[in-house]
Amino acid sequence: MPNTHKITPQEALLRTIEHREIFHDEMLHIMRGIMTGEWSPVMMAALITGLRVKKETIGEITAAAQVMREFSTKVNVADTSHLVDIVGTGGDGSHTFNISTCAMFVAAAAGARVSKHGGRSVSSKSGSADVMESLGVNINLSPEAIAQCIEQVGVGFMFAPNHHPAMKNVAPVRKELGIKTIFNLLGPLTNPAGAPNILMGVFHPDLVGIQVRALQRLGAEHAVVVYGKDGMDEVSLGATTLVGELKHGEITEYEIHPEDFGMVMASNRALKVETPEQSKTMLQGVLDNAAGAPKDIVILNAGVALYAANVVPTMSAGIDKARVAIESGAARAKLAQLVSMSQQLKGAAK
């Protein structure tokens, strides 16, 4: 095949209009141009809208994620065994409290090491960074300090803008467009600590198969990609969840149901919040072992994360461990440890 990677913005845009794929090397070239600010905001907006209309392919997503990783500020964790990210693409419009943020403390208390990669609210009522800050966690630590948190506490939070400085060129365009774009798919694929394991929630059923295959191409070890049929980008308590799993290089797709794990189904209405403050209150309630749907959905998601992190051999075993982590107070203690350590390391902030 000829060397086609030098593609102009206009050629790339035409390709999306004609519903034709942009090849891997071309996508690398395009993304590098976007990251270095070579592309004008108009062409950037046109291309990412065109990709969305055409529907991004696994190859396009993989190439774009490779470039984002290339330009990112890394967190070097010495031992990545049992290291997992618990993350959603967001944009599911469900306005629930920060389930994955809460689940990370539970998973860490039960033996996983969690490198959580998140940002402020884009489409939800409360982004993971918003709620972490309100809990007292210092979200602006240096990469070295975050690695220390992961190694010593078992959990670290990476505030996305600090690790993807090149994204500043795209941020205003994304904000003004106000639609989901390829960048919603890329954030969860670009963990700065290089977590080899991941529990990823997606906002559309088609993305289960797409994202798990992108993760396979990007070299992930154990990935569990989920979509709740009630529209949630989490393992759902109110519906069947579609799962795409990558393990030992093989992909399997299947469905799970809360009742498979002895859980009582509940509508996600009980999980809705309006403000980061409400999200914080609900999250603290879960860690304080308050019974109800919020606790159950966190147990479900933390349990699946423990399975993704290879701490347990089955999702059921993970769910049992997650329940103990909450009921023993270990998950609550994990939050306190992260708050304390992140504040102590403030001197190491950016």
From Swiss-Prot:
Entries under InterPro entries matching the protein: Anthranilate_Pribosyl_Tfrase, Glycosyl_Trfase_fam3, Glycosyl_Trfase_fam3_N_dom, Glycosyl_Trfase_fam3_N_dom_sf, Nuc_phospho_transferase
Residues the entry annotates as binding Mg(2+) 2: D233, E234
Oligomer and partners: Homodimer.
One GO CC term, this protein: cytosol
Superkingdom of the organism of origin: Bacteria
Lineage: Bacteria, Pseudomonadati, Pseudomonadota, Betaproteobacteria, Burkholderiales
Catalytic activity: N-(5-phospho-beta-D-ribosyl)anthranilate + diphosphate = 5-phospho-alpha-D-ribose 1-diphosphate + anthranilate
Name of the protein: Anthranilate phosphoribosyltransferase
Residues that coordinate or bind anthranilate 1: G88
Function summary: Catalyzes the transfer of the phosphoribosyl group of 5-phosphorylribose-1-pyrophosphate (PRPP) to anthranilate to yield N-(5'-phosphoribosyl)-anthranilate (PRA).
Keyword Secreted among UniProt keywords: no
Pathway: Amino-acid biosynthesis; L-tryptophan biosynthesis; L-tryptophan from chorismate: step 2/5
Sites where the protein binds 5-phospho-alpha-D-ribose 1-diphosphate: 88, 91-92, 96, 98-101, 116-124, 128
Binding site for Mg(2+) 1: S100, E234
Cofactor(s) recorded in Swiss-Prot or TrEMBL: Mg(2+)
Keyword Magnesium: yes
